[in-house]
Amino acid sequence: ADKTLYGPTLDRVIDTYGKVPRDTTDDGGYASIANMEYAKSKGVVNVVFNKIVGSLKNQVSSLSMETRLKKWRSGIEANISNIKRGFNLKRCNWKGWANFQAKVLWSIIAYNIRVMTGLIVARL
């Protein structure tokens, strides 16, 4: 089911920023030849899926670019996991969209403060 969301999501990114991303690195649930071809048709240079399906191969300018994109995505996943576990974002019991947004916003701010203070303490 995720495979059908790839094209509309890429289009929304292009519409929002007015620019085609040079690189994409995506979850294996989006991996399909159709999505790879769609990204290429939009002008994306490097397309990396976390998990390869069948004969599909990642389209990258170099092996080092593929490695960098995979590591970047792993770092993002680690941040998301940290936020979910450390700031109880597994489930939001706050009622309403505005309250949900407030919970996420303040959790992200708290996470960033924790990361920054950790970096400052490490320098001491």
Predicted segments with their positions:
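Active-site beta-loop-alpha junctions of metal-dependent nucleic acid enzymes
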Residues: 1-17
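Short, conserved catalytic/metal-binding motifs centered on acidic residues
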Residues: 6, 21-31, 46, 76-83, ...
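Residue-identity detector for glycine
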Residues: 7, 18, 28-29, 43, ...
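Short glycine-/small-residue-rich flexible loop motifs, especially phosphate/cofactor-binding loops
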Residues: 11, 36, 81
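An internal, acidic/charged active-site-proximal segment
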Residues: 14-71
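Basic, amphipathic alpha-helical segments enriched in Lys/Arg and hydrophobic/aromatic residues
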Residues: 66-124
